Amino acid sequence: MHFKPFVFALLILFITPAVFAQEADNNNKTSDTQLSEPSELQIFRKAFPDTTFTATYSERLEDWLITVSCPTTPITTANPATSSKRREITFCWCEGRLIPEAELKRKSHYLPVLEEYPFGGELQSPSTYTKAQIEEYRQAGLASARKNEPFASQFLSDFMYYGSSRKSVEQHLARIKFLGHKVTVNEFIIEPLARVEKRILEERKTSTTIDTFLKGIDHMDGYNWREIRDVERKSLHGTAIAIDFLPIKMNKYMYWRWTKDILGDKWMLASLKSRWMPPYEIINIFEEEGFIWGGKWLIWDNMHFEYRPELIEFYKQTHTEKQ
């Protein structure tokens, strides 16, 4: 009986440090998790400075929850306080897919939002394609592959640009004049397009190439609520963040599908000289202002530009890190 207090004291002496050690270990795990938010969030923050991306770790889902908060209407340079109202949504990070929790069971259908886009530079001549490259183009153009392959998640862009339904996006459209042509676009890309226009018109003063190109444009297409052929998903024209340049003379190849109808399986080998393309000076200006050009896709669409500043920022950050 006299030994019981002594034994109890010994137990406390040995058990207490173990408990504290375990507690410290748990705290370290929490701390590590808090410090390990997805690094790609910095890309989104830089691409969309008026939008906040807040990460909270979910033990239940074992994944990050990303709360996105953006203005209800565009905040412009001329009117920086245009809107103090904001809207919020929370996505699961899901390895960069940014999808609602309800879509987790279908996550294999989606690719990450951030995908490689070859910012800057010029196109490779088709005459130098390897057999592997030609096969890659051929596979990309197969209807079966295009319909069944996973695609980049659009839940973020649908939220930011009200693209989840035709009714919602049509409440945020504007008819503007761009490079002398009327076009309907999402109100959130009016200012980026204005920056593009200002730079192109300035370059036009000393560039006969740009002047000739602009004089050859018949009209432009912007908003069009429709699906992409063969894949049954909404085009970004449906979100109104894309525009197409349509020339007066349609005497060159400008879209892979139309080219395939003429050249068959050798559509990807159409020479650059035989393709209708904007001058690189114009392409570079668009890219520097956050737009990507469809002419750099495997299934190329040379008339097409769309506002994707996150892809431009993704290229800059990943390629800077590699240097």
State where each predicted segment sits.
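Active-site acidic/histidine clusters and adjacent loop/turn architecture
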Residues: 144-213
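A generic secondary-structure signal for well-formed alpha-helical elements
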Residues: 14, 200-208, 289-290, 309
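Boundary at the C-terminal end of the N-terminal hydrophobic targeting segment
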Residues: 19-23
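Acidic, glycine-rich low-complexity/disordered segments
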Residues: 209-228
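Bacterial N-terminal signal peptides
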Residues: 8-17
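Bacterial N-terminal signal peptides that target proteins for export
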Residues: 1-7
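N-terminal accessory beta-strand-rich subdomains and adjacent acidic, glycine-rich linkers
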Residues: 32-165
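Catalytic cores and adjacent binding grooves of peptidoglycan-active enzymes
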Residues: 32-51, 55-82, 87-93, 227-323
